[in-house]
Amino acid sequence: MSETHLSNQKFADFSLNKEIKTALNESGFEFCTPIQALSLPILLQKKDIAGQAQTGTGKTLAFLVATFDHLLSTPVPEGRQLNQPRAMIMAPTRELAIQIAKDATLLAKHTGLKVGIVYGGESYDVQRKVLDKGVDILIGTTGRIIDYVRQGIINLSAIQAVVLDEADRMFDLGFIKDIRFLFRRMPDAKSRLNMLFSATLSMKVQELAYDHMNEPEKVVIAPNEKTSKNIKEEIFYPSMDEKMRLLLSLIEEDWPEKAIVFSNTKHSCENVWSWLEGDGHRVGLLTGDVPQKKRIRILEQFTEGKLDILVATDVAARGLHISDVSHVYNYDLPDDCEDYVHRIGRTGRAGKKGVSVSFACEEYALNLPAIEEYITHSIPVTNYDSEGLLDDIPAPIRVHRKHNNRPQQGRNNSGRPQGRNGNRAGGRNGPRRHDQVRRHS
């Protein structure tokens, strides 16, 4: 983390439980981010907050530290049963819930508090076995939590702390009725610690906060600009015929350590994936049709560096928290201006530099004026040499193909991707096909 991303406030200066301080210290957390520095003094006084903060600002650690400290400093409800969690964290997507649970384990291993996670797309029985053993902190998506509540597997009458993360997304995805259903089954708002976080504190989000929280204090970390100064933006105007070749050429030229390619439709994402896969790149595909177990595996491979490129739709990528993304490629300009900000905001996080490359083709160029008005600046235009684009591109790989023991096209016997003439393309260490710069100002 860079110094500009952190405040001067140290976690050690807070009156936190010693086990929490130990966990933070072992994980390398010394200084707070601004949202942590502002929210924790309020939360540690057992006061509710409604926080406005963008993804990547450290809000997850803020509410996890507050939740763990609250449970450790508050007596367990008398007569609490095994099926009664003491805290609940609601997330709009399973990917975000999984990420929160991973972060929570850093604190759980030192404090003795048990963490459980539930979300759709996974076996009810597998998740139920965890719940049957009892959990202190329940993390999950609202739909699956409601299923277990209605079955009597979970009882919310002992909840002492509750977190609603990315509340604005909850509205966008139509989960507000679910949230109100769950709040009505918890103890009174005054008897629990309530935390709400949202990228924007719109009137509907504030109404939700005041309906189900105890006079929450507002904590606002609003960026001065919708897009970070750490992100270098550029836009190209390719023809439809050259669009794919331009993408492949730029990826070859940029050789990104970790990149996400966004496209507007499932079909387009599959097409992009097939060309990248055929060209020997280590690439994963995330669309709404990808089964949940495969989604999790792809995300783990991407996070661990086993995949270098992720191709995704906006819906499939919602709630993803992946660090160290160096490049974002908007193969299609999004129809929604906010999606542009969300997309490129996945790079340039925590004070690091990032690159955003967008294509304004014939089909989506009309989206550009609204996007530039929304972000209050023009995106620098970069020209390119059509004659310099790659022309020795292998045929794309079919999306739905059978796997067998024979080596696939573009792969060697070890299963690792290969580049041109069998050169290894994976790992960002293999030789590239050219050194020619294709960008022209």
Swiss-Prot record:
Transmembrane regions: none
Entries under InterPro entries matching the protein: DEAD/DEAH_box_helicase_dom (IPR011545), DEAD_box_RNA_helicase (IPR050079), Helicase_ATP-bd (IPR014001), Helicase_C-like (IPR001650), P-loop_NTPase (IPR027417), RNA-helicase_DEAD-box_CS (IPR000629), RNA_helicase_ATP-dep_RhlB (IPR023554), RNA_helicase_DEAD_Q_motif (IPR014014)
Catalytic activity, EC: 3.6.4.13
Gene Ontology cellular-component annotations: cytosol
Motif placement: DEAD box: 165-168
Domain Helicase C-terminal: 243-390
Cross-referenced Pfam families: DEAD (PF00270), Helicase_C (PF00271)
Subunit and interaction comment: Component of the RNA degradosome, which is a multiprotein complex involved in RNA processing and mRNA degradation.
NCBIfam families per record: PRK04837.1
Name this protein carries in UniProt: ATP-dependent RNA helicase RhlB
Species for this entry: Shewanella woodyi (strain ATCC 51908 / MS32)
Gene behind this protein: rhlB
